[in-house]
Amino acid sequence: MKAFLILEDGTVFEGTSIGSTKEIISEIVFNTSMTGYLEVLTDPSYAGQAVCMTYPLIGNYGICHEDQESLKPWPDGYIVRELSRIPSNFRSEDTIQNFLKKYDIPGIAGVDTRALTRILRKKGTMNGMITTNAAYNLEEILPRLKAYTTGKVVEKVTCTETHVLEGNGKRVALLDFGAKDNIAQSLNRRGCEVTVYPAATSAETILASDPDGIMLSNGPGDPKECTAIIKEVRKLYESEIPIFAICLGHQLMALATGADTKKMKYGHRGGNHPVKDLETGRVYISSQNHGYVVDTETLNPEVAVPAFENVNDKTNEGLKYTGKNIFTVQFHPEACPGPQDSGYLFDRFLEMMEVNQ
């Protein structure tokens, strides 16, 4: 069956329908990872977005549920150049097309994803529609595309109940704004007992549990939409408990302490982004997935100073908080998919908790 990807600038790509045949409107973004498509699909940070994979062949090793970063896929839609319909992998349990159908997610194959990516890089991230309706009306569709917003998506992806990953070491409170499983697993593998809390949990509840450390997770959407959460993060900042924040959590901490964030032209999404440690000068290759960034010009150096920056575009990739046991990063040290270069940051967090005892 034919499918169409329609961008808000009027560009139309024709391809073949994969997954569900329902019609969706979403923010179109691109990911440059060559592998790890299942981890991308199950990353809650993609809620409210349709993902274009720039690598030309997707699906060749199938679906291995053990590798999922959450229980289900989160993107509104999926865009690929060529879909491998016969995966070759002894671990494979399903195909991408079946996986998308199961969760009612529409996709389109046969799209010139390099051309699409060039458009998004030149004009910036834009909204789009995936449809199987060949009689589409651009005059009717384009105003709808321009009016679309992702809105408050954290509440859609956070856990509904508190749950615990047992451990014999430090006790960490993880606020789930759309956390990838490997954040909690990275702590648990280091012996930590990790208690995962819903995003709307009050700071008082977190602090009453007397954790050794607090982790603020990744998540989807515009951080400025999380007004209630930002107020609670401010209370956590004022405590003396060590805090480590990743991605959206990094942005929320910045907003909670008086800095500002801004939307990027097309964001960073992939497993090959170089970041520089500004203290040592060392460069690490990182996994990233964000469309917003902390505006370093709005930082108060008495509160926080840049700790990492992106080598390519010099945007902020991390902050160190003055006089506090708090550090935050924009990238993903848990990787999955991506390199493990910055996994040492979890060890730094453990050391911080140990010293704070």
Positions of PLM-derived features:
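RNA-binding accessory domains that recognize and position tRNA/RNA substrates
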Residues: 1-204, 208-209, 223, 336, ...
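Residues that mark the start of a beta-strand
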Residues: 169-173, 193, 242, 285, ...
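Cysteine-nucleophile active-site neighborhood
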Residues: 213, 218-285, 293, 338-353
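Active-site glycine-centered loops adjacent to acidic/histidine catalytic or metal-binding residues
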Residues: 112, 247, 290, 332
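Hydrophobic beta-strand scaffold residues
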Residues: 106-107, 194, 243, 261, ...
